[in-house]
């Protein structure tokens, strides 16, 4: 949510995380978040939800996202939010072209700075359709593949639609180093 009163009420009702697609930029959002003990997922988005996909442009998408993360971390700390509470989300599909999204994924490790967890939401995204031309419900296998790529490149948290398939794939991926070491 991006609405401070909803953040406060969500925390009161037992939410485990505050996730704001606007990166806690609305007036009062950081103050409301600071008043909770919850972790914050700060997401990058160019523009606003209703216009974000209208010709998104960057000189350098990695620098743009990294600068946004630095700026928001400074703002979080100024609001009294401990660094350890901050999770970053590069905002796949939020004000980015498919090319931007694939570039971010390929270089995701470069966003893993300062020990902050990176959360990614790649499941069923339109970037998959840019390659496979499939409807969202037909993007399960590609979504699982993207989740694996993201974790391999440093993502700590993956937000998915197909939990069992993704969990199984990550379990197999995680078992590989153990079997090699034996």
Tell where the protein language model's regions lie, with residue ranges.
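Active-site-adjacent loop and "lid" segments of alpha/beta metabolic enzymes
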Residues: 4, 11-12, 16-75, 95-182
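Conserved phosphate-donor
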Residues: 78
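Short acidic capping loops at alpha-helix termini that bridge into adjacent secondary structure
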Residues: 82-85
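Active-site metal-binding loops of divalent metal-dependent hydrolases
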Residues: 92
């Amino acid at each position: 949510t991006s609405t401070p009163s909803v953040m406060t009420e969500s925390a009161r009702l037992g939410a485990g995380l505050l996730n704001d697609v606007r990166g806690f930029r609305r007036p009062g959002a950081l103050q409301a978040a600071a008043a909770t003990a919850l972790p914050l997922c700060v997401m990058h988005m160019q523009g606003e939800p209703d216009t974000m996909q209208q010709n998104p442009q960057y000189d350098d998408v990695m620098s743009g996202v990294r600068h946004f993360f630095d700026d928001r971390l400074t703002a979080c700390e100024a609001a009294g939010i401990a660094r350890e509470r901050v999770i970053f989300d590069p905002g796949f599909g939020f004000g980015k072209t498919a090319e931007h999204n694939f570039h971010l994924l390929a270089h995701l490790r470069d966003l893993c700075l300062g020990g902050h967890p990176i959360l990614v939401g790649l499941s069923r995204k339109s970037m998959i359709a840019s390659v496979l031309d499939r409807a969202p419900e037909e993007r399960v296998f590609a979504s699982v593949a993207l989740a694996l790529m993201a974790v391999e490149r440093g993502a700590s948290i993956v937000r998915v639609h197909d939990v069992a398939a993704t969990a199984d794939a990550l379990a197999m991926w995680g078992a590989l180093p153990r079997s090699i070491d034996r």
